[in-house]
Amino acid sequence: MLSHMLKAKLHMAKVTQAELWYDGSCAIDADLVALAGMREFEQIDIYNVSNGERFHTYIILAEPGSGTISMNGAAARKVAVGDRVIIATYGHFTEAELLNHKPKLVYLNENNGVERTSNAIPMQVA
């Protein structure tokens, strides 16, 4: 049996563009895509921390080092420039693969620069 698990996420990315009439998808700085171990055309879930919207789309590459996070096509209606979003990818893993699986977590600053990376989320306590 396969388990559907978090593979990677870009945490608190800042939306830099929203292009309604561009081909649909989410353009992400190619350096951030590579650092997170994501891939061009991979399906992503986007969680808009600023307004609560949650939706699916896929990755297209934006200029490396640009800090670009651009929601395009229908996704542009789900965000405003400046919104903070979490961009997540998931994968299917066997029980054997899960023994060593750790997600790649990339935490971003206000300018979509890398603050830090991790492979664990601290346990939430009351």
Swiss-Prot record:
Active-site residues per Swiss-Prot or TrEMBL entry: 25 (schiff-base intermediate with substrate), 58 (proton donor)
Cofactor(s) named in the record: pyruvate
PTM (free text): Is synthesized initially as an inactive proenzyme, which is activated by self-cleavage at a specific serine bond to produce a beta-subunit with a hydroxyl group at its C-terminus and an alpha-subunit with a pyruvoyl group at its N-terminus.
InterPro entries, A to Z: Asp_de-COase-like_dom_sf (IPR009010), Asp_decarbox (IPR003190)
Keyword Disulfide bond listed: no
Pathway(s) where this gene product acts: Cofactor biosynthesis; (R)-pantothenate biosynthesis; beta-alanine from L-aspartate: step 1/1
Reactions catalysed: L-aspartate + H(+) = beta-alanine + CO2
Residue pairs linked by disulfide bridges in the UniProt entry: none
Keywords for the protein's UniProt record, in alphabetical order: Autocatalytic cleavage, Cytoplasm, Decarboxylase, Lyase, Pantothenate biosynthesis, Pyruvate, Schiff base, Zymogen
E.C. number: 4.1.1.11
Pfam families referenced in this protein's UniProt entry, alphabetically: Asp_decarbox (PF02261)
Residue numbers carrying Pyruvic acid (Ser): 25
GO biological process: alanine biosynthetic process; pantothenate biosynthetic process
Chain sites annotated for binding substrate: 57, 73-75
Keyword Lyase: yes
Domain of life: Bacteria
Entry's localization field: Cytoplasm
Entry-linked CDD domains: Asp_decarbox
UniProt record similarity statement: Belongs to the PanD family.
PANTHER family: ASPARTATE 1-DECARBOXYLASE (PTHR21012:SF0)
Subunit structure of this chain's protein: Heterooctamer of four alpha and four beta subunits.
Function field: Catalyzes the pyruvoyl-dependent decarboxylation of aspartate to produce beta-alanine.
Name used for this protein in its record: Aspartate 1-decarboxylase
Name of the coding gene: panD
